C-alpha cells in the first residue's frame, strides 16, 4: 500500500466520518441540545409551548435517544416488534403521545372543523343562491360565523363535491330504472 493510502486509512480509523448531508445532520439530531428553538409556523390549530412562558418562543422538547437507538420516524410506517419495544422502553406513553402531537403539523394534518347547526344552515342558504361565492362573500361569512375564510372555502368545495356525487348517483339510478323497465317490456 502506498504511503498516501496508508495515511488516509489511518485518518479514517481515528476520525468518525460524518457527512454534512446525513439525515441526522440535516434534522439536527447530531446536536446535544435539549431544546431546539423553532420559528412559529402559521398553524392556528397546533398546540404551542413556550420555553419560559414570558418570551413566547416556541420550543420543541425532543430528548436525545441513547446511543444505538435511532430516532423514530415521523411517518407512520409499521415497525418490527423488536424496534418498537426499544422505543416503548425509552419513551413513556405520555411522552410518545406528546411528541406525536408536537410533530403532527409536519404531516399537514389539522383537527376537523366541527360546524354548528346554525353555521351549516347559513352556509347551506348561501350555497343555494351561489355555489361559487367570491372571496368577499366568504370573508363576510367568516366574520359573521366566527370561522376562518379558508374553512369556508373548503366547506363550499366539499359541498360542491357532495352535490356532484349525489347528481351522479341519481343519474345512475335513473339509468338503471330505465334499463330495467326496457328489459321488462
Curated annotation (Swiss-Prot):
SMART domains: HOX
Subunit (UniProt): Can form heterodimers with PROP1 in binding to DNA. Interacts with TLE1.
Recorded family membership: Belongs to the ANF homeobox family.
Disease per UniProt entry: Septooptic dysplasia: A clinically heterogeneous disorder defined by any combination of optic nerve hypoplasia, pituitary gland hypoplasia with panhypopopituitarism, and midline abnormalities of the brain, including absence of the corpus callosum and septum pellucidum. Growth hormone deficiency with pituitary anomalies: A disease characterized by low or absent growth hormone levels, in the presence of a hypoplastic anterior pituitary lobe and ectopic or absent posterior pituitary lobe.
Positions of the DNA-binding region: 108-167
Effect on the protein of changing residue 109 to Q: In CPHD5; uncertain significance; loss of DNA binding ability; unable to repress PROP1-mediated activation; no effect on nuclear location; no effect on protein abundance
InterPro entries with a match to the protein in the record: HD, Hesx1, Homeobox_CS, Homeodomain-like_sf
Entry's localization field: Nucleus
Gene Ontology MF term list: chromatin binding; DNA binding; DNA-binding transcription factor activity, RNA polymerase II-specific; DNA-binding transcription repressor activity, RNA polymerase II-specific; protein homodimerization activity; RNA polymerase II cis-regulatory region sequence-specific DNA binding; RNA polymerase II transcription regulatory region sequence-specific DNA binding; sequence-specific double-stranded DNA binding
Name used for this protein in its record: Homeobox expressed in ES cells 1
CDD domains in UniProt: homeodomain
GO CC terms, sorted: chromatin; nucleus
Gene transcribed to yield this protein: HESX1
Outcome (variant: residue 149 to K): In GHDPA; unable to repress PROP1-mediated activation
Keywords assigned: Developmental protein, Disease variant, DNA-binding, Dwarfism, Homeobox, Nucleus, Transcription, Transcription regulation
Pfam families per UniProt: Homeodomain (PF00046)
Organism: Homo sapiens
Predominant localisation class: nucleus
GO BP terms: brain development; camera-type eye development; canonical Wnt signaling pathway; cellular response to cadmium ion; ERK1 and ERK2 cascade; forebrain morphogenesis; gene expression; gonad development
Reported function: Required for the normal development of the forebrain, eyes and other anterior structures such as the olfactory placodes and pituitary gland. Possible transcriptional repressor. Binds to the palindromic PIII sequence, 5'-AGCTTGAGTCTAATTGAATTAACTGTAC-3'. HESX1 and PROP1 bind as heterodimers on this palindromic site, and, in vitro, HESX1 can antagonize PROP1 activation.
